[in-house]
Amino acid sequence: MSFTNTPERYGVISAAFHWLSAIIVYGMFALGLWMVTLSYYDGWYHKAPELHKSIGILLMMGLVIRVLWRVISPPPGPLPSYSPMTRLAARAGHLALYLLLFAIGISGYLISTADGKPISVFGWFDVPATLADAGAQADFAGALHFWLAWSVVVLSVMHGFMALKHHFIDKDDTLKRMLGKSSSDYGV
C-alpha cells in the first residue's frame, strides 16, 4: 500500500485520516451526549468539556491538514461503473461531510470562547478568543453545534451504508479502495 493515493486506491495517509477521523468524530459525539447529562457536582462536569474542546481543536487542525492532503494527493476518481447520479451523490456527500465538520468546529469554538477566554488544548497551547461577552453567541452556537453534530453522524452512517451497499450489492471495489486494495474495475 502506497503512502500517497493512486488512481486505483487510497494511500496509507488518506486511509489513516479517514478511519481516525471517523473514530474521533463518533467518540466526540458520544462524549458530547454524555457530558450534557452530568450534574454540577459530578467529577467530570468540568473535565469532560475541557477534553471535548481540546480534542475538537486537534480534530479541526487535522481536518485542515486532511483537506491540504487531498490537494497534494488527490483521491482516486470514481469507478467506471458509477452512474452519473452515483458520482454526483458521492461528491455531494463528501463535500457535505467536510462542510459539516468545519461548521461543527467553528460552532464549538464560538461556544467555548463566548466568555472571552481562550481554549487551552491539553495545556500545550491556547487558542485565543476572538469575541468577548457574547452570551447570545453561545446559545445560538450551542443549538447549531447540537444539530450539526447529529447531521454529521446521520450523514456518516449513510456514507458507511453506501460503502457496504457498493461492496455487498453492487460488488464493486469502493470499500476495498479505502482499505488499500486494488480495484479490479481498473484491471489491476
UniProtKB/Swiss-Prot annotation:
Keywords noted in UniProt: Cell inner membrane, Cell membrane, Electron transport, Heme, Iron, Membrane, Metal-binding, Transmembrane, Transmembrane helix, Transport
Highest rank taxon of the organism: Bacteria
Cytoplasmic side: 1-15, 76-91, 165-188
Name this protein carries in UniProt: Cytochrome b561 homolog 2
Membrane topology type: Multi-pass membrane protein
Pfam families: Ni_hydr_CYTB
Family: Belongs to the cytochrome b561 family.
Main location: membrane
Chain residues that bind heme b 1: 18, 159
